[in-house]
Amino acid sequence: MKTVYMGTPDFAVPPLKALVEAGYEVAAVVTQPDKPKGRGKTLMATPVKEEALMHEIPVYQPQKIRNNQEFLDTLKEIQPDIIIVAAFGQIIPKEVLELPKYGCINIHASLLPKYRGAAPIQQAVIDGEKESGVTIMQMGEGLDTGDMLSKIVIPLDKEETGGSLFGKMAQAGAELLIKTLPSIEQGTVTPEKQPQESPTPYAAMITKQMGLMDFSKPAAELERLVRGLNPWPSAYTFVNGKTLKVWKSVLGQETSDAEPGTVMGTDAQGIHVACKDGVLILTEVQLEGKKRMEAEVFLRGYHMEAGPRFTDHKE
Protein backbone atom coordinates (compact mmCIF):
# COMPACT_ATOMS: atom_id res chain seq x y z
CA MET A 1 0.00 0.00 0.00
CA LYS A 2 1.63 3.22 -1.20
CA THR A 3 0.94 6.10 1.18
CA VAL A 4 1.32 9.86 1.23
CA TYR A 5 1.50 11.33 4.72
CA MET A 6 0.29 14.84 5.52
CA GLY A 7 1.05 16.27 8.96
CA THR A 8 2.90 19.06 10.70
CA PRO A 9 3.34 19.19 14.54
CA ASP A 10 4.77 16.80 17.14
CA PHE A 11 1.38 15.02 17.34
CA ALA A 12 1.86 13.81 13.76
CA VAL A 13 5.36 12.36 14.27
CA PRO A 14 4.57 9.01 16.01
CA PRO A 15 2.11 7.88 13.28
CA LEU A 16 4.69 8.62 10.57
CA LYS A 17 7.35 6.77 12.53
CA ALA A 18 4.96 3.82 12.98
CA LEU A 19 4.23 3.67 9.24
CA VAL A 20 7.93 3.43 8.44
CA GLU A 21 8.59 0.83 11.16
CA ALA A 22 5.64 -1.28 9.97
CA GLY A 23 7.11 -1.40 6.47
CA TYR A 24 4.58 0.74 4.64
CA GLU A 25 5.81 2.61 1.59
CA VAL A 26 5.66 6.32 2.43
CA ALA A 27 6.15 7.81 -1.03
CA ALA A 28 5.99 11.41 0.14
CA VAL A 29 5.39 13.62 3.14
CA VAL A 30 3.46 16.89 2.85
CA THR A 31 3.89 19.42 5.64
CA GLN A 32 3.64 23.13 6.29
CA PRO A 33 6.43 25.45 5.09
CA ASP A 34 9.39 26.19 7.37
CA LYS A 35 8.68 29.12 9.69
CA PRO A 36 11.00 31.72 11.27
CA LYS A 37 11.43 31.21 15.02
CA GLY A 38 13.37 32.74 17.86
CA ARG A 39 15.06 36.10 18.12
CA GLY A 40 17.15 35.47 15.03
CA LYS A 41 14.06 34.46 13.04
CA THR A 42 15.86 31.35 11.83
CA LEU A 43 13.77 29.18 9.52
CA MET A 44 12.75 26.02 11.38
CA ALA A 45 11.48 22.81 9.83
CA THR A 46 8.29 21.23 11.14
CA PRO A 47 8.68 18.16 13.40
CA VAL A 48 7.16 15.99 10.66
CA LYS A 49 9.66 17.27 8.08
CA GLU A 50 12.54 16.48 10.41
CA GLU A 51 11.25 12.94 10.90
CA ALA A 52 10.72 12.45 7.15
CA LEU A 53 14.24 13.59 6.31
CA MET A 54 15.66 11.10 8.83
CA HIS A 55 14.06 8.36 6.71
CA GLU A 56 15.00 10.01 3.39
CA ILE A 57 11.35 10.48 2.42
CA PRO A 58 10.66 13.21 -0.18
CA VAL A 59 9.08 16.27 1.47
CA TYR A 60 6.68 18.77 -0.11
CA GLN A 61 5.79 22.07 1.56
CA PRO A 62 3.18 23.96 -0.47
CA GLN A 63 1.99 27.29 0.94
CA LYS A 64 -1.55 26.31 -0.04
CA ILE A 65 -2.88 23.05 -1.42
CA ARG A 66 -6.26 24.42 -2.48
CA ASN A 67 -6.34 25.55 -6.14
CA ASN A 68 -2.75 24.34 -6.52
CA GLN A 69 -2.51 22.48 -9.83
CA GLU A 70 1.22 21.85 -9.47
CA PHE A 71 0.67 20.07 -6.14
CA LEU A 72 -2.25 18.08 -7.56
CA ASP A 73 -0.14 17.00 -10.54
CA THR A 74 2.60 15.87 -8.15
CA LEU A 75 0.12 13.69 -6.25
CA LYS A 76 -1.16 12.21 -9.51
CA GLU A 77 2.39 11.29 -10.47
CA ILE A 78 2.94 9.60 -7.09
CA GLN A 79 -0.38 7.69 -7.38
CA PRO A 80 -0.85 6.95 -3.67
CA ASP A 81 -3.26 4.21 -2.63
CA ILE A 82 -4.17 6.24 0.44
CA ILE A 83 -3.42 9.64 1.96
CA ILE A 84 -3.06 9.76 5.74
CA VAL A 85 -3.65 13.11 7.45
CA ALA A 86 -2.73 14.07 11.02
CA ALA A 87 -2.92 17.71 12.14
CA PHE A 88 -1.79 18.96 8.73
CA GLY A 89 -3.03 22.52 9.17
CA GLN A 90 -4.87 23.11 5.89
CA ILE A 91 -8.28 22.03 4.59
CA ILE A 92 -7.93 19.18 2.10
CA PRO A 93 -9.73 20.04 -1.18
CA LYS A 94 -12.16 17.67 -2.91
CA GLU A 95 -9.81 16.89 -5.81
CA VAL A 96 -7.20 15.59 -3.33
CA LEU A 97 -9.75 13.68 -1.24
CA GLU A 98 -10.95 11.78 -4.32
CA LEU A 99 -7.51 11.01 -5.78
CA PRO A 100 -6.32 7.88 -3.89
CA LYS A 101 -7.88 4.44 -4.28
CA TYR A 102 -8.80 4.31 -0.58
CA GLY A 103 -9.38 8.04 -0.24
CA CYS A 104 -7.97 10.13 2.61
CA ILE A 105 -8.14 9.17 6.27
CA ASN A 106 -7.62 11.45 9.25
CA ILE A 107 -6.23 10.73 12.72
CA HIS A 108 -8.44 12.90 14.94
CA ALA A 109 -7.69 13.38 18.65
CA SER A 110 -11.19 12.86 20.06
CA LEU A 111 -13.93 10.27 20.24
CA LEU A 112 -15.96 11.61 17.35
CA PRO A 113 -18.58 12.97 17.00
CA LYS A 114 -17.44 14.75 20.18
CA TYR A 115 -14.94 17.59 19.85
CA ARG A 116 -14.75 18.21 16.15
CA GLY A 117 -12.30 21.02 15.45
CA ALA A 118 -8.71 22.12 15.86
CA ALA A 119 -8.20 21.76 19.63
CA PRO A 120 -9.99 18.62 20.88
CA ILE A 121 -7.18 17.63 23.27
CA GLN A 122 -7.14 20.83 25.32
CA GLN A 123 -10.93 21.15 25.22
CA ALA A 124 -11.49 17.68 26.67
CA VAL A 125 -9.34 18.61 29.70
CA ILE A 126 -10.96 22.05 30.07
CA ASP A 127 -14.43 20.48 29.99
CA GLY A 128 -13.56 17.91 32.64
CA GLU A 129 -14.06 14.82 30.48
CA LYS A 130 -13.32 11.52 32.20
CA GLU A 131 -12.16 9.96 28.95
CA SER A 132 -11.27 10.92 25.41
CA GLY A 133 -9.48 9.10 22.63
CA VAL A 134 -8.55 8.92 18.98
CA THR A 135 -10.76 8.32 15.96
CA ILE A 136 -9.60 7.35 12.49
CA MET A 137 -12.13 8.66 10.01
CA GLN A 138 -12.68 8.74 6.28
CA MET A 139 -12.29 12.34 5.21
CA GLY A 140 -15.03 14.22 3.37
CA GLU A 141 -15.60 17.85 2.57
CA GLY A 142 -17.07 18.58 6.03
CA LEU A 143 -14.88 19.41 9.04
CA ASP A 144 -14.37 16.16 10.99
CA THR A 145 -17.75 14.82 9.87
CA GLY A 146 -16.67 11.79 7.81
CA ASP A 147 -17.41 8.14 8.51
CA MET A 148 -15.62 6.71 11.55
CA LEU A 149 -13.43 3.69 10.85
CA SER A 150 -11.90 2.89 14.25
CA LYS A 151 -11.52 4.30 17.76
CA ILE A 152 -9.38 3.93 20.86
CA VAL A 153 -10.44 5.20 24.29
CA ILE A 154 -7.99 6.98 26.61
CA PRO A 155 -8.91 7.59 30.30
CA LEU A 156 -8.01 11.05 31.62
CA ASP A 157 -6.12 11.33 34.91
CA LYS A 158 -7.26 13.81 37.56
CA GLU A 159 -4.06 15.78 36.97
CA GLU A 160 -4.15 15.46 33.17
CA THR A 161 -2.80 18.45 31.27
CA GLY A 162 -3.11 19.39 27.64
CA GLY A 163 0.54 18.43 27.26
CA SER A 164 0.33 15.02 28.94
CA LEU A 165 -2.80 14.07 26.97
CA PHE A 166 -1.17 15.29 23.75
CA GLY A 167 1.59 12.70 24.19
CA LYS A 168 -0.85 9.89 24.96
CA MET A 169 -3.03 10.77 21.97
CA ALA A 170 -0.10 10.86 19.54
CA GLN A 171 1.09 7.40 20.56
CA ALA A 172 -2.44 5.97 20.58
CA GLY A 173 -3.05 7.43 17.12
CA ALA A 174 0.06 5.71 15.79
CA GLU A 175 -0.99 2.34 17.21
CA LEU A 176 -4.57 2.68 15.97
CA LEU A 177 -3.39 3.61 12.47
CA ILE A 178 -1.28 0.47 12.10
CA LYS A 179 -4.19 -1.68 13.36
CA THR A 180 -6.68 -0.03 10.99
CA LEU A 181 -4.78 0.06 7.68
CA PRO A 182 -4.98 -3.71 6.96
CA SER A 183 -8.78 -3.70 7.31
CA ILE A 184 -9.00 -0.73 4.93
CA GLU A 185 -6.82 -2.51 2.36
CA GLN A 186 -8.73 -5.80 2.72
CA GLY A 187 -12.12 -4.10 2.59
CA THR A 188 -13.21 -5.50 5.95
CA VAL A 189 -13.53 -2.18 7.79
CA THR A 190 -17.08 -1.18 8.72
CA PRO A 191 -17.56 2.60 8.41
CA GLU A 192 -19.85 4.19 11.00
CA LYS A 193 -21.68 7.35 10.01
CA GLN A 194 -21.56 10.32 12.34
CA PRO A 195 -24.68 12.16 13.46
CA GLN A 196 -25.08 15.55 11.85
CA GLU A 197 -24.84 17.36 15.19
CA SER A 198 -21.98 16.91 17.65
CA PRO A 199 -22.89 16.47 21.35
CA THR A 200 -20.16 18.99 22.25
CA PRO A 201 -19.38 22.50 21.00
CA TYR A 202 -16.85 22.88 18.19
CA ALA A 203 -13.30 22.73 19.63
CA ALA A 204 -12.01 25.94 18.11
CA MET A 205 -8.33 26.73 17.74
CA ILE A 206 -6.73 27.77 21.04
CA THR A 207 -5.74 31.42 21.40
CA LYS A 208 -3.66 33.15 24.06
CA GLN A 209 -6.72 35.16 25.10
CA MET A 210 -8.48 31.94 26.15
CA GLY A 211 -6.02 31.63 29.03
CA LEU A 212 -7.19 34.78 30.83
CA MET A 213 -8.54 33.67 34.21
CA ASP A 214 -11.93 35.02 35.24
CA PHE A 215 -12.18 34.46 38.99
CA SER A 216 -15.93 35.09 38.92
CA LYS A 217 -16.15 31.55 37.53
CA PRO A 218 -16.19 28.39 39.70
CA ALA A 219 -12.82 27.30 41.10
CA ALA A 220 -13.14 23.84 39.54
CA GLU A 221 -13.61 25.37 36.09
CA LEU A 222 -10.47 27.48 36.49
CA GLU A 223 -8.44 24.52 37.76
CA ARG A 224 -9.34 22.63 34.57
CA LEU A 225 -8.47 25.67 32.45
CA VAL A 226 -5.00 25.77 34.02
CA ARG A 227 -4.43 22.09 33.21
CA GLY A 228 -5.93 22.24 29.73
CA LEU A 229 -3.76 25.16 28.61
CA ASN A 230 -0.52 23.75 30.04
CA PRO A 231 1.97 23.97 28.30
CA TRP A 232 0.50 26.34 25.70
CA PRO A 233 -0.60 29.07 25.87
CA SER A 234 -0.97 28.77 29.69
CA ALA A 235 -3.58 30.31 31.95
CA TYR A 236 -2.74 33.77 33.24
CA THR A 237 -3.92 36.72 35.30
CA PHE A 238 -2.57 40.15 36.22
CA VAL A 239 -1.11 41.43 39.49
CA ASN A 240 0.17 44.97 40.03
CA GLY A 241 0.17 45.59 36.29
CA LYS A 242 2.22 42.49 35.43
CA THR A 243 1.22 39.22 33.79
CA LEU A 244 1.28 36.19 36.07
CA LYS A 245 1.16 32.84 34.30
CA VAL A 246 -0.42 30.04 36.30
CA TRP A 247 1.05 26.63 35.51
CA LYS A 248 -0.49 24.56 38.29
CA SER A 249 -3.32 24.96 40.76
CA VAL A 250 -5.43 22.91 43.16
CA LEU A 251 -8.86 23.37 44.67
CA GLY A 252 -8.87 24.80 48.18
CA GLN A 253 -11.03 23.22 50.88
CA GLU A 254 -12.12 26.53 52.38
CA THR A 255 -15.08 28.67 51.31
CA SER A 256 -15.03 32.40 50.69
CA ASP A 257 -17.52 35.23 50.32
CA ALA A 258 -14.81 37.69 49.26
CA GLU A 259 -14.88 39.40 45.90
CA PRO A 260 -13.63 37.03 43.16
CA GLY A 261 -9.92 37.47 42.49
CA THR A 262 -9.12 38.51 46.07
CA VAL A 263 -5.99 36.97 47.60
CA MET A 264 -7.23 35.21 50.74
CA GLY A 265 -3.75 34.44 51.98
CA THR A 266 -0.56 32.56 51.20
CA ASP A 267 1.16 29.53 52.72
CA ALA A 268 3.55 26.73 51.79
CA GLN A 269 0.95 25.32 49.42
CA GLY A 270 0.57 28.51 47.40
CA ILE A 271 -1.58 31.59 46.79
CA HIS A 272 -5.22 31.20 47.87
CA VAL A 273 -7.57 33.13 45.57
CA ALA A 274 -11.31 33.66 46.00
CA CYS A 275 -13.49 32.40 43.14
CA LYS A 276 -17.23 32.30 42.49
CA ASP A 277 -17.90 29.29 44.69
CA GLY A 278 -14.71 28.60 46.61
CA VAL A 279 -10.95 29.03 46.57
CA LEU A 280 -8.31 28.17 43.99
CA ILE A 281 -4.73 27.71 45.19
CA LEU A 282 -2.08 28.74 42.68
CA THR A 283 0.80 26.32 43.25
CA GLU A 284 3.16 27.03 40.33
CA VAL A 285 3.43 30.46 38.72
CA GLN A 286 5.60 32.66 36.51
CA LEU A 287 5.73 36.43 36.83
CA GLU A 288 6.33 38.45 33.68
CA GLY A 289 10.08 38.46 32.91
CA LYS A 290 10.84 35.75 35.49
CA LYS A 291 11.29 31.99 35.50
CA ARG A 292 8.55 29.46 36.18
CA MET A 293 8.62 28.35 39.83
CA GLU A 294 6.63 26.83 42.66
CA ALA A 295 4.45 29.41 44.38
CA GLU A 296 6.24 28.82 47.68
CA VAL A 297 9.56 29.85 46.06
CA PHE A 298 7.90 32.76 44.25
CA LEU A 299 6.52 34.12 47.52
CA ARG A 300 10.00 34.30 49.07
CA GLY A 301 10.91 37.04 46.62
CA TYR A 302 7.48 38.57 46.02
CA HIS A 303 5.67 39.83 49.10
CA MET A 304 1.96 39.17 48.83
CA GLU A 305 -0.45 39.67 51.71
CA ALA A 306 -4.15 38.92 51.93
CA GLY A 307 -6.34 41.57 50.36
CA PRO A 308 -5.02 42.50 46.89
CA ARG A 309 -6.95 41.32 43.85
CA PHE A 310 -5.89 39.60 40.68
CA THR A 311 -7.42 41.39 37.70
CA ASP A 312 -8.31 40.57 34.11
CA HIS A 313 -6.36 43.50 32.69
CA LYS A 314 -3.09 45.39 33.11
CA GLU A 315 -3.71 48.30 35.45
Predicted regions and their residues:
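One-carbon transfer enzymes
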Residues: M1-P233, G278-L280, L287, A306-E315
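An anion-binding loop in the catalytic cleft
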Residues: F215-E315
